[in-house]
Amino acid sequence: MRELRPGLWHWNAPHPQWEPTEPWDQNVSSYAIDDGERLLLFDPLSVPPEIEQLAADRETAIVLTAPWHERDTQPLVERLGFPVFTPLPESAEVLIQKYGITAEQAGDGSPDLAWLVREKKGEARLYSPGDRLPFGADVFPGREPEDTVLWIESHRAVVAGDTLVDFGEGLMIPSEWLREAVTREQVVEGLRPLLELPVEHVLATHGGPFDRAALERALSPEEPKVDPASRAT
């Protein structure tokens, strides 16, 4: 674990469901932000003991960039009772519309966070693009409505799930993860307002922290030649 700036931590952990065929690295990133009163855990996996100790003295919440990034959310909620801020998982209707599957295949909708959202085994605080969350975060649209990008004003940080990633070549919008109906240009258009903000840190949960220059390249009109050297140190 390392502290990127006062009150902002980053750590890596191996994802238990990773397969060698995945384009992303086995080690994924999680983050914690502390403002002195509230502690936020972003897409948490293998939370370090020091962060758990700090959580005992703070109003702590888990923040998921996407429902499928729950990682260690369920055991943390079961053990410590943290509320969970998350986009709403895909309903059956959304799955049918997106992927052209049958109602039978769609079932009750996405199984992501079913224990939290459908079975009510925790406190879910659902959010959508365009929302401003109570801890001062603005929600921007990602490559899907359920895959968000967050602007944390207090720490001048952008947190991204699967919309801004690093597969070993620097920060980028992953074209292989875009549905046929979604273009890179559409994603860039939704995120371009971030460039008007005083962004200093880009916290990718696949790849680690980057700087503002990496964000500018990732959101350039033309798909950029990425630069791994832009990784934050």
Language-model features: locations:
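Active-site HxH/HxHxD metal-binding segment of metal-dependent hydrolases
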Residues: 46-131
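Active-site-proximal loop/helix segment associated with metal-binding centers of metalloenzymes
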Residues: 15-27, 96-128, 145-147, 167-176
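Short linear motifs in intrinsically disordered
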Residues: 21-24, 74, 138
